[in-house]
Amino acid sequence: MVRNSSDEEEDHRNLIPQNDTRDNDLNLRPDARTVNMANGGGRSPRSALQIDEILSRARNRWKISVNKRYVVAAVSLTLFVGLLFLFTDTRTFFSSFKLDPMSSRVKESELQALNLLRQQQLALVSLLNRTNFNSSNAISSSVVIDNVKAALLKQISVNKEIEEVLLSPHRTGNYSITASGSDSFTGSYNADICRKVDQKLLDRKTIEWKPRPDKFLFAICLSGQMSNHLICLEKHMFFAALLDRVLVIPSSKFDYQYDKVIDIERINTCLGRTVVISFDQFKEIDKKNNAHIDRFICYVSSPQPCYVDEDHIKKLKGLGVSIGGKLEAPWSEDIKKPTKRTSQEVVEKFKSDDGVIAIGDVFYADMEQDLVMQPGGPINHKCKTLIEPSRLILVTAQRFIQTFLGKNFISLHLRRHGFLKFCNAKSPSCFYPIPQAADCISRMVERANAPVIYLSTDAAESETGLLQSLVVVDGKVVPLVKRPPQNSAEKWDSLLYRHGIEDDSQVYAMLDKTICAMSSVFIGASGSTFTEDILRLRKDWGTSSMCDEYLCRGEEPNFIAENE
């Protein structure tokens, strides 16, 4: 039976197996799809179901394939992490992923540098204001120059600090960017500005003290406190050397007990012969005359001859000292208006064949200042100075410095008790308000670059407390160290306890002088003999500094009270 082509095609379609895995029309050739469409073309319901089933199976297979891939990826990642921990330094590895802090460090340094530049600007403005002074408050040119130098040095240091701050973020590990060498410059310049004073010992002019053993000069010192008496005693030595006499040290019943604070016998050692003797030794030598003063040749004539009143004459006689003749002066000499005298004038007026003479108090004597003010004084000897603290006081001062101060410190003698009226009687006054004094001290601290100040003062706690709060440099309070009250737990003053002189006020006064004389820089009180004796020791010991000065030198107090 002959079948037409259309029947054969239909039979062919019906013979396709149900489990055929080929895709739908998307997988048919283009020409087959064209023929199918031309013959009326839609699929039967059965063929549509078969295609859906095929698509569902394909999707299931895809899901299984994806799940397998996830498992493989997870296993691979686990193996990788395990190998990473086994064969690498994880700390180093993960640290490499940290954020670089360089930018934040640079920003912080820049802010610090800006702040320092602002401080530098304010300091330079302050310096400019300090140099703009008028004639009513004239500051000596040397003071201005010193202050300008110190301020400029300070600003160089600030500039160095700014440089360090800006460079700090760039210093990492062993690598370092080096700043300029201004620190060595400022260090050497700072040392130079407060360097020790050249003593010029080779230019020293002296006289010999070779006394006749039977000729004596009886020392009498009455004005003021211990410092005045020591200055008077030193001048007596000069007179004794000029007059070829042995100097008799006064009795402690008439004057201070000098052997507690100075070593009398050491003076003889320094000259290699007996030039001074104690009052007791004098009485022993002069037994025949019963300690008799043959003649008073008074250096001072006014307000009273020899500056000795009747009460002191009675005290001398009470010691068994007899006095021959009257108290007479060879010239007119007023303590309020001292006249400059020469060595030749003294020898002419005071030369005598009498065995024992006295010239009275010579504290106010103004004689041969160029010789007297030399390091070591006007007399030839082999020591640094003739009058210096005893060995006990000297070692105690050294122990105090080692305990509390160290090598580099400023010493300050701040005289306050009874000083207000004394200073206001002078022109200009030397009594400064505490805030003004603190400003002067702070400037000196900047110049000397010292970390601590030793304070020798008779001021009340209310004044020293205020001063301590106001002495500020670079935003930091500079410590003011005072000698502490006696404490048995502290051993720095054990030598004084051991020798029974721990309760003597004159011993502690000399201890204060000794500590001040050993400082790097000294600030004194103008008009105070305590300060003058410290300056003498510093000059003789070679500790004087180019920065040594009186408090607020060249300035007047910014406020002065009226007279009563």
From Swiss-Prot:
Swiss-Prot/TrEMBL keywords: Carbohydrate metabolism, Fucose metabolism, Glycoprotein, Glycosyltransferase, Membrane, Signal-anchor, Transferase, Transmembrane, Transmembrane helix
Top-level taxon in the UniProt lineage: Eukaryota
Disulfide bonds: none
Cross-referenced InterPro entries: OFUT2-like
Membrane-protein topology: Single-pass type II membrane protein
Signal peptide interval: none
GO CC list: membrane
Keyword check for Iron-sulfur: no
Coiled coil: none
Enzyme Commission number(s): 2.4.1.-
GO biological process: fucose metabolic process
Sample GO molecular function, one term: peptide-O-fucosyltransferase activity
Gene3D superfamilies reported for this sequence: 3.40.50.11350
Presence of the UniProt keyword Cell division in the record: no
Glycosylation sites noted in the Swiss-Prot or TrEMBL record: 129, 134, 174
Principal location listed in the UniProt entry: membrane
Transmembrane intervals: 70-90
Residues given in the record as substrate binding sites: 413-415, 529-530
Region (Disordered): 1-28
Protein's pathway: Glycan metabolism
Localization annotation: Membrane
Family: Belongs to the glycosyltransferase GT106 family.
Name assigned to this protein: O-fucosyltransferase 5
